[in-house]
Amino acid sequence: MAGEQKPSSNLLEQFILLAKGTSGSALTTLISQVLEAPGVYVFGELLELANVQELAEGANAAYLQLLNLFAYGTYPDYIANKESLPELSVAQQNKLKHLTIVSLASRMKCIPYSVLLKDLEMRNLRELEDLIIEAVYTDIIQGKLDQRNQLLEVDFCIGRDIRKKDINNIVKTLHEWCDGCEAVLLGIEQQVLRANQYKENHHRTQQQVEAEVSNIKKTLKATASSSAQEMEQQLAERECPPHTEQRQPTKKMSKVKGLVSSRH
């Protein structure tokens, strides 16, 4: 659910430019201002500055630790190390709680109010919902409150800073994701191949059936034509019986008749 970082880059760039020429207490003051600044929720570039890293070896090391905590940590991390860290202003406290919500949202699509109340050390539901609404308006998360089931349903959240030591894990996760995609693609290709084979076999069978039907039609047509011719011939024979020749009187009969007449 983690998404691209929302606009805070211009303001952060201004702080980075100021920090490059700053040291000592002036730098710690600048860090405090960055941690309070509205819209600034990523701190990796500031942490990479050499003079900021130099704070680790001086009296102001706690401010470097605090900056690291805002970059990678959560509100429970601050509470666990509160004694060794500078005290937070109200604005810084709310921002760290917002970042804690982002961290939870990157792992869970539906965050129970009970989890939020525990991690943010809040007891009042109304205050919790107001804090969530603030986070939504700052565009670091998108979602809705399910008051009936007491859930925060997350649709989107920004991405937080990434430690260098975590990059290998991210690369490993991406490789696993790519392997999974390749396996899915291979499965789809096999299904397409089977579908094409089925289609080809079906088409071949259909052609065979059509050829057989055509042959049967031709046979039936030829048989019907032959039967019709035979029937016509039989009808013709019935309507026209064979002609019998009449006997012609012979000359002997005529002679006999002449003899009879002469005797009279």
Curated annotation (Swiss-Prot):
Quick one: where's region Disordered?
A: 223-264
> Mostly located where?
cytoplasm
Q: Which residues form a coiled coil?
A: 194-237
Q: GO cellular component terms?
A: COP9 signalosome; cytoplasm; nucleoplasm
Q: Where in the cell is it found?
A: Cytoplasm; Nucleus
Tell whether Coiled coil is among the UniProt keywords.
yes
Picking any one GO biological process from the record gives:
COP9 signalosome assembly
Nucleus in keyword set: yes
InterPro entries recorded: COPS7/eIF3m (IPR045237), CSN7_helixI (IPR041481), PCI_dom (IPR000717)
Q: Where is the composition biased (Basic and acidic residues)?
A: 235-248
Keywords on this record? Acetylation, Coiled coil, Cytoplasm, Nucleus, Signalosome
Q: Which residues carry this modification: N-acetylalanine?
A: A2
Membrane-spanning ranges = none
What SMART domains does its record include? Answer: PINT
Sequence ranges assigned to domain PCI in this UniProt record = 2-159
State the similarity comment: Belongs to the CSN7/EIF3M family. CSN7 subfamily.
**Role description:** Component of the COP9 signalosome complex (CSN), a complex involved in various cellular and developmental processes. The CSN complex is an essential regulator of the ubiquitin (Ubl) conjugation pathway by mediating the deneddylation of the cullin subunits of SCF-type E3 ligase complexes, leading to decrease the Ubl ligase activity of SCF-type complexes such as SCF, CSA or DDB2. The complex is also involved in phosphorylation of p53/TP53, JUN, I-kappa-B-alpha/NFKBIA, ITPK1 and IRF8/ICSBP, possibly via its association with CK2 and PKD kinases.
Subunit structure of this entry?
Answer: Component of the CSN complex, composed of COPS1/GPS1, COPS2, COPS3, COPS4, COPS5, COPS6, COPS7 (COPS7A or COPS7B) and COPS8 and COPS9. In the complex, it probably interacts directly with COPS1, COPS2, COPS4, COPS5, COPS6 and COPS8. Interacts with EIF3S6.
Name this polypeptide is given? COP9 signalosome complex subunit 7b
Q: Which gene encodes it?
A: Cops7b
